[in-house]
């Protein structure tokens, strides 16, 4: 097999470098997700936050998961992103009166109806 195909062979140096680049690119892509209150914006194809869309709880949870993995991988910006998103789950998205979490928040900061997260 020629050298260029080695990046697809598990555990070769080329494969490790290739996967490391993909990992770095994926983590860098999503770093704009965090809203000021901690909930997660949807992102466009270039990673730009879509501030005109709802910020949903499940996306915020996903980003906590992704950037928690980033912490384990040594990404220096991931701890602040996880902290901000967890803050959003504990404050902005949480229904402190009735328990559970709101499904999301509209761009004008109104809660989405039909709570599903308890």
What kind of region is each of these model predictions?
Residues 1-118:
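Glycan-recognition and catalytic cores of secretory/periplasmic carbohydrate-active enzymes
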């Amino acid at each position: 097999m020629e050298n260029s195909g080695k990046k697809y062979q598990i555990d070769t140096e080329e494969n490790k470098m290739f996967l490391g680049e993909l990992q770095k690119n994926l983590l860098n892509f999503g770093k704009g997700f965090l809203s000021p209150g901690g909930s997660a914006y949807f992102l466009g194809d270039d990673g730009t936050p879509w501030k005109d869309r709802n910020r949903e709880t499940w996306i915020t949870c996903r980003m906590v998961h992704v950037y928690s993995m980033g912490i384990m991988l040594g990404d220096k910006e991931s701890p602040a992103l996880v902290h901000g998103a967890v803050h959003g789950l504990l404050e902005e998205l949480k229904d402190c009166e009735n328990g559970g979490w709101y499904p999301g928040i509209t761009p004008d900061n109104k809660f989405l109806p039909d709570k599903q997260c308890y």
